[in-house]
């Protein structure tokens, strides 16, 4: 395992983000390195509500449920190659204004963007097959 200076731990070959130390993590912007294929912990920072921007690698293919729940992200750009958005991925991200979905996206999980109250615009890709229940519930600004 390898842990960076912000308390984010990756597996030995650095293809999976496996743990985020909530007491050490204090970034407003964080970049997950290229080569990481999965995020297996979430960024719900109980004591730290600073994360405004996350840069995801083009190699990302899997994210755990609740990945960014309650984070103060303002924008999220999901990489091409990602086929599924997990359940509750951005639930209650109250600062989230903009999301860019990849053309490869097939599934949006349950409550993925629920309560993102200022999310105002999202373009759904042509190949999208499934939008689970409440994916956009209470997104009162969505057009």
Task: Tell where the protein language model's regions lie, with residue ranges.
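Consensus positions within tandem repeat domains that build extended binding/scaffold surfaces
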Residues: 42-43, 64-67, 86-89, 109-112, ...
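Structural signature of tandem-repeat unit edges
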Residues: 1-14, 21-38, 47-62, 71-84, ...
